[in-house]
């Protein structure tokens, strides 16, 4: 019997992202700008299919062909005639919606595979109009993905590197050691891994690695500017490396084409130069060009239409260095943005409150934009609640960054309507319902601005110049002079690799917990007196509960975490439990249904004392290890609290089973499309259900659907042999 965690439930929450009012307030020029940026984002987002699993592209194309010819309502009649029950057909729609929402058949939040919860998938494919019209092509598509569609062999249950899971950031014969030597090579050439994939081959008995850059240009000829000398053959540590361009080339061409059209409607020179550099980046595979575009983006203060695009977050690279493509376009929510602007203005007063010496903070706080946005488009594998970007350490440290809170995402994702309030005491539930969303708004603001936006990295550049006084700065954890730092081209991601993402999320979450105790912060968000105290309590209670819920994202077989944020929250739960003195309670109980359950409690009177002291000490350690590039110390600390075992005061392995028993599926979002009609841009909205989500995707790519699908399949076929190592007999041979 298949574990239910690998199915998406038929009653999964699906909600439309409301952006109609914000869009209608835009000028005609702003609407055109938003439209073409959205098109660029959506086409680039298709690269995520190729970054997720070997079968994702084939499943996507199969579904597109079916739904382009028959909308969900029409296809339902065919399904009934083919012998599917209404529950079976709903399961089919939910699976298809899940594939679109996650841009692949692995959950974007948790990296677990999901499979169709119906046995008659093939019967429906064969009965579809698409099959009647193109039976040979549809049968070939089905044969190429049908085994992997349902397969739950141990390695295929989750994303991972080597024997820990599936990844298409690396060829199937790569392991952690290959990722490490490739990172050393990239560092030696001052190349970023963000827009690369790694393919390991045998060249006459000698190991050869291909580093492939995402670019529209496929030839490795010399071109003007950065990257002209990076492509070619190299020898490094007795291994061969080939750096070449052309990954996702047809998709990058579309991205560049739409960006060029968006540039015509840019509001200012910063936006124009930003887009020019993005185009250069996606044309040549140049991260340096993307960094330059990001600099112009930072300078573009307070735009009405905000956007960002590229290979951004490294959560899903098992090694933690390669970025998943994402692009968003959003409209500023002025009322909410005023609160965040006040928080930015208070940042220089709040930063000294953080528990590390002044030398461990940036020399100067570069006040960023911090806006609340209503999302029009968010292309990629999932939609976050807030963002702090760019992720380039050198820019963040000395030039600045931007923060955004995605208001319409928060309104839907963190709504308490229909939520199962698991693991809470009855006495806490009403308070939790009332303050969950407001408290999370405070946490997101602090997490993004003063979490990700705080803290210095100690660096020695290529010329031997230090950004700190190594003869005076004392490590507060040892009482001795700082003895380690980042050298040359080393970055936070390249040094801390596999734990970097989760560790940094944990640091930012701790900053949020710590500073939400500040009355000035609470006042900025409109909370005073008892209301402010309730917001603090629910914020801490939410974090503790999230730490328990995080166990869903731990895989005992490989002893690995599949989601950076949830690992971070579990770590914080462990820290607060360790603090003792009755601050946090966690006990296993029997539920009213007779099944295992659990209850968490937080003593609100001890949050400002025991709780604050515990976070103070832990947060200081996190920052010190990060600032000093102390990988050994940081990893030992983080691994200690990340451990999930059945020993000690709490049996977390058994609690994990309870969490899985009572888990609730993550919501999916339906996003609108934009369409040019003469001189106007129309917003096309869809119903908030699985059918609406499906329609949004089929209509999104209908203009050049046949060519696009052919391009995707060709890209996937080219690399099919590279996945044979990890998929074994399940993957048909090349040429299928």
Each PLM stretch: what is its role?
Residues 76-79, 269-276, 461-467, 521-541, ...:
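Short, glycine/acidic-rich hinge or "gate" loops at secondary-structure transitions
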Residues 27, 268, 440-463, 480, ...:
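Active-site recognition of the HExxH zinc-binding catalytic motif
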Residues 93-96, 100-440:
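Contiguous, non-catalytic segments that form substrate-binding/exosite surfaces or channel walls
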Residues 595-724:
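Extended, compositionally biased alpha-helical segments that mediate assembly or anchoring
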Residues 19, 48, 492-495, 499-506, ...:
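Long, well-structured alpha-helical subdomains associated
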Residues 2-74:
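N-terminal-proximal low-complexity accessory segments that begin disordered
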Residues 455-504:
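Post-HEXXH active-site segment of zinc metalloproteases
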Residues 724-736:
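Glycine-aromatic micro-motifs
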